[in-house]
Amino acid sequence: MPRSRINGNFIDQTFSIVANILLRVIPTTSGEKEAFTYYRDGMSAQSEGNYAEALQNYYEAMRLEIDPYDRSYILYNIGLIHTSNGEHTKALEYYFRALERNPFLPQAFNNMAVICHYRGEQAIQQGDSEIAEAWFDQAAEYWKQAIALTPGNYIEAHNWLKITRRFE
């Protein structure tokens, strides 16, 4: 039974109903419909913290999905799972892959910046200020890209850039 039929969450149920209607109305191939079903089930599993199941659904959606824009969101969600699991190197890889297909994902730039900032903080704790500065500089570059795509968002990042004199 597809996950969307067993999920008791009202919002997920509403999303599933709307998605099913759209799939019937919008002309799509059976492969596109199947890819979306796996993507939807992946999001449902991810929202419940069932990351292994979510990844299985996302990988299957990736196998079927041909549209680069849609693939970017699948890759982004895979990155989110790896971030949640503390697998930052893998997460960065998936965010990069998402941005290769869709360079207008400010949330991917933001998440990459957060990981780099975290690594900078770790380097400070280990007493390596030179490495920390390199990570902070990289975080700044990613935050600048996120802010450029969505001015007015990422206020804390914008303030950090100003305070650390990394904003131009």
From Swiss-Prot:
Which stretches are TPR repeats?
35-68, 72-105, 120-153
Q: Which GO terms describe its cellular component?
A: chloroplast thylakoid membrane
Q: Which Pfam families match?
A: TPR_1
Q: Which InterPro entries match?
A: PSI_Ycf3_assembly, TPR-like_helical_dom_sf, TPR_rpt, Ycf3/AcsC/BcsC/TPR_MFPF
What is its subcellular localisation?
A: Plastid, Chloroplast thylakoid membrane
- Major localization listed first in the record, in broad terms: plastid
**Tree of life domain:** Eukaryota
Mind listing the UniProt keywords for this protein, alphabetically?
Answer: Chloroplast, Membrane, Photosynthesis, Plastid, Repeat, Thylakoid, TPR repeat
Q: Name one GO biological process term.
A: photosynthesis
Which family does this protein fall into? Belongs to the Ycf3 family.
What's its job?
Essential for the assembly of the photosystem I (PSI) complex. May act as a chaperone-like factor to guide the assembly of the PSI subunits.
- What protein am I looking at? Photosystem I assembly protein Ycf3
Which species? Atropa belladonna
Protein encoded by which gene: ycf3
